[in-house]
Amino acid sequence: MRVLGFLSSHAGTGTAAAHTRWRWLAPLGIQAIRPASASAGGNAVSSATPQAPPCPIHANVGVGRASALGPGPSGFMAPSAGIVTAIRDGPNSNSRCSTVRTHATRSKSTGPSRATSSGPATAAPPRRRRRTSNDTQDGGLTSEQTPTNTAVAAVAATAAAAAGASASAAAPALPVALNPTWRTPPTAEAARRITQAASASAAYSGSSAAAAAAAVAAGPSSAASVARGGSAAAARSAAASALAANANTSSGAASAAAIAATASTAPGKLLLGGDLSRALAAAGSTTAPPLPLPSRAGLSAPKHTASAAAAAAAAASVLPASTPAAASQTPPTTVTSCGTGSGAPATPRAARSPTAAVSVSSADAAAAAAAAAAPASAAATAAAAVLPTRHIVAAVDPDLNGALALIYWDEDPNDPTTATASGPAAATTDAAAAAAAAAAAATGPAARLATLAAAAPPGSGAAAAADEAAAAALLWLPTPPRPPADASRWRVCVWDMPVSAAERQKRTASGQVARRRLLHVAGARAVLSAALAAALPPPGEARPVALYGYVEVPPILPGDGNIAAYTSLWSTGSWLGLLTGMGFTVGSTPVRRWKTDLGLYGAKGKDASLALARALFPGQQPILRHKKNHGRADALLIAAWALGACLPRGLGASLRRNGITLDQLLQQQPGTTVGLVWGPPRPPAPTDAYGNLLTPEQDMWDEIEAAETKVERKAQARSSTARRRKTAGTQEEPEAQAEEEQAEAGTGVVAAAAGAAAPKRRRAKKAAVESGSEAAVAEVAAGPQEEGSEGEVAGQGGRACRSKSRSKSSGKSSSKAEAGGAGSGRRRAASVGSSSVGSSSVGSSSGGGGGGGGGVKAPGASRRRGGAKAGSDGGVSGSESE
């Protein structure tokens, strides 16, 4: 890869200074061209014409300071626009794309030769380096992997010949299809589950896309549209142009409202009115009959489903058959089409889903579906009316300043350079998988991890990847094909992100009203619906549709606040749900992954992404003028990354090794633009924000069975607990009743004994006490004896209650509480009774003594008023003291 800046000749003034200026590019492996001499005026334009037209498949487009090109077969002149094209060289490049070295600088080349400033290129052994995702020219293939890839291709070709796929074997062999190098390699079980989930997603995508096309085709006035075919097409084109104008000139919620208002008069108003969801729900009646799930050996090969073709045939049965002119008619342009011929031709097919039967083409499936529902003539008409598949790739930058980029194109089955990622050169590990991949070559693109043969040389590093290769043989993910080489056949749409704002009570430091911005979900749905209405085939075209969605998933960094993290997750989750609900096969795109592949990871600003987007999509330069348009640039670059765009060979590794980012390169050399090369497309893989492949923990049916088993287990546990409690209650009730009866009987016996033993209180008459009769004296003398007997009875009652409470401690808690309460109450009653009896006897004796002896104060004199009045001599002093 050469960065073309100033052009120079080998002779002239300023050569040494220019060589010193561009010498810093040598460690990066970038071939630079010196500035022109002063005699040429510094802006010399070469008059040489290219000897052969450039090959757009391997073209790198960039903008240099000078609008001139050096002579040679590798470039073409574009002085008006200042477009410079550099063709990468390599053993697998096209013969027309050969490159001539115009100048030799001192650099560390990774190729088979090393150029020095003092002499010609000398042969040098290839340097061994670590493989990175899409870091080499052919999708991550290093020089030491070439024999292995050749052997794998030979094994696959042999299996294809054995399977009878002569058409696939005749296709030109491509290098091993590269897929992302996962951060966490999947196991065999994980690969099987991911494949099953991806197959179900692809089947849903195919059926939902067919239903959406049928919903657009079967509008409220289908009969009128049949009668007015030309006027309806003109109205659709005008509506699409208005949608494009609104998408490019407006922003935010106003753009969403304008899009919704314009699309309400377009054929896609069914999508805005909610009929798309009902159409998707009704799409089950048009899908093919369910087939048994595939085995593990057959999961590596994708198969077709007749859902899209059947829906297309059903739409064609009610709409007029397409004429050749209508079939060749290009779809309406929503936004300025991309002018760079930067794609590779491919022949993708309709959406797939795995089946156990042999795969069939979409035309055969459409013919079979039509034959089952209509006469033979109608079946032939429907089969002839089925057009090539339309592939729609949606890329979303979910940032509030982001955008939605949509790229769609129609396949060309007559292209002689047709080749898919699952062709004869696909890497496999055994003959059965190779035969399955070769048989599936005619069904459409399918991405698999780059696996190596088990018989690879030990030095190639393939032996260490045997486990990963065995697991990757089962992994299949739906992948979009390469866009066509003709840039006029694919369209690019850009839609700004609809944002809503809520005012907060807290004001900013400057006194302004603080607003919290958030994605407007309804506006995002309106934007996506309008984009689909513009990209889906118009009514009258029985064309299958394949949908692929890529959503950037930013990681949550430690320095992010709660509001920032919530806003990011809200937007990302909303777009994932919207794309999935619309029928897209959605995958996560980690920020670090796609920016590393494009050389933007670690960039401080947005100038590098804007420059890359302008160079890659020159037709979108009017909407990429300002720095605030970096969201549109990121969305376009994500779409390009999904279609296989990457840095040139070795440039990304050189930048990382030297600690230089692409934005720093552009800042140091403002007139330098590094172009991108196109490799195999990348599948919409289910990954997290860090590139880890998300694996379903269990299969779908296993999860359902596990949930049902869990519910049954909980119900059984509840019923067994209830039975156990009921049984324990029935056994404890008789024992508790017996204990209660025994306790009551014991309490009654003790109370009766206490009542019989306790003497009754004698009430002395006031006159007898005052007179100091012999009866009062006898009562005072009998007081201590009665007090002793009462204390003995109270002690017996207390001991009986304590023994009774100890016997009940082994019973139920409720019985124990009742028994304890009764015992404590009885103990308190007995103690209170004994104390009252004792105090009365002591008071009587003290009163009698006071009456007889007079003047002697007894302890019980203050408690008995009668004792205080007893003494004639000392009674007065006693009453006064009281």
Swiss-Prot record:
GO terms for cellular component: chloroplast. Residues 845-857, 868-882 have a biased composition (Gly residues). Its cofactor is Mg(2+); Mn(2+). GO terms for biological process: DNA recombination; nucleoid organization. The keyword Transit peptide applies. Its main location: plastid. It is an enzyme of class 3 (hydrolase). It is found in: Plastid, Chloroplast. It catalyses: Endonucleolytic cleavage at a junction such as a reciprocal single-stranded crossover between two homologous DNA duplexes (Holliday junction). Its EC number is 3.1.21.10. Residues 112-125, 323-337, 744-758, 769-783, 810-819, 830-844 have a biased composition (Low complexity). Residues 91-111, 134-148 have a biased composition (Polar residues). Keywords: Chloroplast, DNA recombination, DNA-binding, Endonuclease, Hydrolase, Magnesium, Manganese, Metal-binding, Nuclease, Plastid, Transit peptide. InterPro entries: MOC1-like. One of its GO terms (molecular function) is crossover junction DNA endonuclease activity. Residues 87-148, 323-351, 710-882 are annotated as: Disordered. A structure-specific endonuclease that resolves Holliday junction (HJ) intermediates during genetic recombination. Cleaves 4-way DNA junctions introducing paired nicks in opposing strands, leaving a 5'-terminal phosphate and a 3'-terminal hydroxyl group that are ligated to produce recombinant products. Mediates chloroplast nucleoid segregation during chloroplast division. This is Holliday junction resolvase MOC1, chloroplastic. It comes from Chlamydomonas reinhardtii (Chlamydomonas smithii). The gene is MOC1.
